[in-house]
C-alpha cells in the first residue's frame, strides 16, 4: 500500500499547475462528476441579497484584474502578463489576444492595482472588478 497517493501529494501537484491547467482541471472535474464549482457562490449571493437590507454592505476584499485591451504594444503586454501570472509564452499570448480576459482573480485590492499599473505602463488596459 506504499503506492497510494495522499491528499498532500495531490495538493503539491496542483500547486505546480499553471492557471490555464487549473481552469481545464476544474472544467474536467465539473463534467466528470456532474457538479458546478459556481453553485456555492450563487447560493451565497442569494443568501447575501436576502440579508443585505438588515446589514450594511460589506467592503469588497477580493478583486479581479481583467485585461480589456493591449493597444499597440501587444508583445510588451504579453511579457508583463507572463511575469504576473507565470504562464508560458503561448498561454500568455492566448490570454492577451483573447481580451477581455481575467489576468488574476480573487486578489487583494493592492495586488489588483499593481497589476493594472504594470499593464498600463506598457500600453495595455485593465479593469479591476
UniProtKB/Swiss-Prot annotation:
One of its GO terms (molecular function) is structural constituent of ribosome. One of its GO terms (cellular component) is cytosolic large ribosomal subunit. InterPro entries: Ribosomal_bL12, Ribosomal_bL12_C, Ribosomal_bL12_C/ClpS-like, Ribosomal_bL12_oligo, Ribosomal_bL12_oligo_N_sf. Keywords: Ribonucleoprotein, Ribosomal protein. One of its GO terms (biological process) is translation. Pfam families: Ribosomal_L12 (PF00542), Ribosomal_L12_N (PF16320). Belongs to the bacterial ribosomal protein bL12 family. Homodimer. Part of the ribosomal stalk of the 50S ribosomal subunit. Forms a multimeric L10(L12)X complex, where L10 forms an elongated spine to which 2 to 4 L12 dimers bind in a sequential fashion. Binds GTP-bound translation factors. Forms part of the ribosomal stalk which helps the ribosome interact with GTP-bound translation factors. Is thus essential for accurate translation. This is Large ribosomal subunit protein bL12. It comes from Syntrophus aciditrophicus (strain SB). The gene is rplL.
Amino acid at each position: 500500500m506504499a503506492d497510494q497517493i495522499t491528499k498532500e501529494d495531490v495538493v503539491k501537484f496542483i500547486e505546480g499547475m499553471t492557471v490555464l491547467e487549473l481552469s481545464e482541471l476544474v472544467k474536467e472535474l465539473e463534467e466528470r462528476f456532474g457538479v458546478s464549482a459556481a453553485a456555492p457562490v450563487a447560493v451565497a449571493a442569494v443568501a447575501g441579497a436576502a440579508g443585505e437590507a438588515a446589514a450594511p454592505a460589506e467592503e469588497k476584499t477580493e478583486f479581479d484584474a481583467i485585461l480589456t485591451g493591449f493597444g499597440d504594444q501587444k508583445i510588451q503586454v504579453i511579457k508583463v502578463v507572463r511575469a504576473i501570472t507565470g504562464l508560458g509564452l503561448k498561454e500568455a499570448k492566448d490570454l492577451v489576444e483573447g481580451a477581455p480576459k481575467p489576468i488574476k482573480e480573487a486578489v487583494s485590492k493592492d495586488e489588483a492595482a499593481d497589476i493594472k499599473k504594470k499593464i498600463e505602463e506598457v500600453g495595455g488596459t485593465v479593469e479591476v472588478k
